[in-house]
């Protein structure tokens, strides 16, 4: 999927930019393969990428980070590593951790034909997370990220899952792709905390 124009950027970089705009500041992964354009995008956004020896470790580290900070973080895995991340996905759901699991999935145009590393990750993740969807159009990457972020941070916080086919991940798009598609909030919002605000609690204690 060569880039024919120096001004064009890959779908993975659009994904990284959209997550950066929402406020994500850490990514946990097992680097390589289908996810390379996203990893390059995260590095261009100067976002710390923590490389781990196994996808389950990446998922649990992301879960732990989200529990402490109460801020959404990303766990990025390839299609063959998705199954390894499922236990962490289940654990994050039980602990209400706003982890955004992103799968670099098999090619969209060969879906259902037994393509290379094909797995129905959206269906597998659906009962474990608050939102599970596949990006089907590179022009709508920011829209899918916004939906996932909203689900992860509203009501009871919890994990979400986005599947990004490799052909969209590596394809080239205009830098402003999807920005005029429809209006939506491109900024972050704090995730609800499971404990009182320390400042408010201090005020109460002073009055006791």
Task: Give the positions of each predicted feature.
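N-terminal alpha/beta PP-like core and its mobile active-site loop of ThDP/TPP-dependent enzymes
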Residues: 1-208
């Amino acid at each position: 999927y060569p880039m024919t124009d120096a001004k064009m950027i890959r779908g993975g970089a659009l994904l990284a930019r959209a997550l950066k705009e929402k406020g994500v500041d850490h990514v946990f992964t097992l680097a390589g393969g289908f996810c390379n354009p996203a990893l390059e995008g995260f590095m261009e956004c100067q976002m710390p990428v923590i490389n781990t020896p196994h996808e389950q470790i990446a998922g649990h580290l992301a879960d732990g980070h989200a529990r402490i900070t109460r801020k959404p973080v990303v766990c990025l895995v390839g299609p063959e590593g998705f199954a390894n991340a499922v236990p962490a996905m289940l654990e994050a759901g039980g602990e209400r951790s706003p982890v955004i699991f992103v799968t670099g999935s098999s090619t969209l145009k060969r879906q259902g034909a037994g393509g290379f590393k094909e797995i129905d990750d959206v269906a597998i993740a659906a009962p474990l997370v608050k939102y599970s969807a596949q990006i089907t159009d590179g022009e709508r990457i920011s829209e899918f990220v916004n939906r996932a972020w909203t689900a992860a941070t509203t009501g009871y916080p919890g994990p979400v899952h986005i599947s990004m086919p490799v052909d969209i991940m590596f394809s080239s798009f205009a830098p402003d792709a999807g920005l005029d598609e429809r209006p939506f909030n491109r900024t972050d919002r704090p995730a609800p905390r499971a404990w009182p605000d320390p400042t408010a609690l201090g005020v109460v204690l002073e009055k006791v």
